[in-house]
């Protein structure tokens, strides 16, 4: 079976899948709504992620065929991005369906589109980038790394694309994890219990895409999730600062990695600078995130 035949097979399967799915769903909407409203929030959270993945799998199948990806082989970056984008584009649609069922709203989840969110977004973005500038400046001064000056010329061509990706990824992840997930868990748990659980889920789900390099980052990712909860609280329950902060971190780190701007000297353990060149897997990155959280807690 060639690629065109496989693609046709997947498209036909998707049409059949959705026809059967919708025919089964239609008479059960009221029953489902009553069940969700009276269920523990853990069940609601599980239902959200299951529906999200089930809706995405047909798209993932098509993308896998188009990209000629074999499931027994590791994902390449050019294969990962289309899969990630297709998954993330579905999240607001799934949440819109939840809101349509009367189980919440985007405003409840912290997404209020007005002028103030742009100010908060800018504040968070600036804070995220500034924190990393301070961390890397300190590492330059201590001789832990140096700047690859010959690669600076690569920056102008990648700044905007990476910025748009960072804004998209940060926005979707904040809407899901500090928005829907945190708000839903708060219905049954105190805010800090909800924060701990949502941040743990946020950290562990990063293992889906890559395990070896992600595993050392799990504590840092959990702390990052907690700080982003603080950012939402500092913003009066809105997601603006958290979204900007998240996007700023992603944009700065991705720009450094893509352009190859930093080379580590090996003067200190990589557990200080970041295992596998990942700041969240090292003491410096963790202190950066922790310091940002302290600033948010006491000064914003």
Walk through the language-model features, giving the residues of each.
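N-terminal, membrane-interfacial amphipathic/helix-forming hydrophobic leader that caps
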Residues: 2-113, 227, 239, 251-300
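Transmembrane alpha-helix boundary signature
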Residues: 100-107, 135-145
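Membrane-interface helix/loop boundary segments of multi-pass membrane proteins
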Residues: 150, 172-197, 211, 230-237
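Histidine-centered divalent metal-coordination motifs
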Residues: 174, 178, 206, 246, ...
């Amino acid at each position: 079976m060639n690629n065109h035949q496989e693609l046709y097979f997947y498209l036909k399967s998707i049409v059949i899948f959705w026809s059967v799915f919708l025919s089964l769903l239609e008479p059960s909407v009221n029953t489902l709504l009553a069940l969700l409203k009276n269920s523990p929030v853990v069940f609601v959270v599980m239902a959200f992620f299951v529906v999200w993945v089930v809706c995405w799998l047909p798209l993932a199948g098509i993308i896998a065929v188009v990209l000629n990806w074999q499931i027994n082989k590791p994902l390449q970056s050019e294969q990962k991005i289309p899969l990630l984008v297709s998954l993330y584009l579905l999240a607001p649609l799934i949440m819109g369906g939840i809101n349509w069922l009367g189980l919440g709203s985007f405003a409840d989840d912290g997404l209020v589109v007005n002028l103030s969110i742009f100010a908060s977004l800018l504040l968070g973005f600036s804070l995220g980038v500034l924190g990393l500038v301070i961390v890397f400046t300190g590492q330059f001064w201590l001789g832990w790394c140096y700047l690859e000056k010959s690669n600076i010329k690569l920056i102008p061509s990648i700044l905007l694309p990476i910025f748009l990706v960072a804004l998209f990824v940060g926005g979707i992840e904040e809407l899901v994890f500090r928005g829907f997930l945190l708000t839903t868990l708060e219905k049954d748990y105190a805010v800090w219990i909800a924060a701990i659980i949502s941040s743990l889920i946020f950290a562990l789900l990063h293992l889906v895409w890559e395990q070896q390099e992600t595993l050392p980052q799990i504590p840092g990712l959990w702390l990052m999730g907690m700080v982003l909860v603080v950012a939402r609280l500092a913003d009066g329950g809105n997601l603006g600062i958290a979204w900007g902060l998240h996007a700023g971190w992603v944009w700065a780190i991705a720009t450094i990695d893509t352009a190859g701007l930093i080379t580590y000297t090996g003067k200190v353990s990589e557990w200080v600078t970041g295992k596998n060149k990942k700041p969240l897997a090292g003491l410096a990155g963790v202190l950066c995130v922790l310091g940002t959280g302290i600033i948010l807690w006491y000064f914003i």
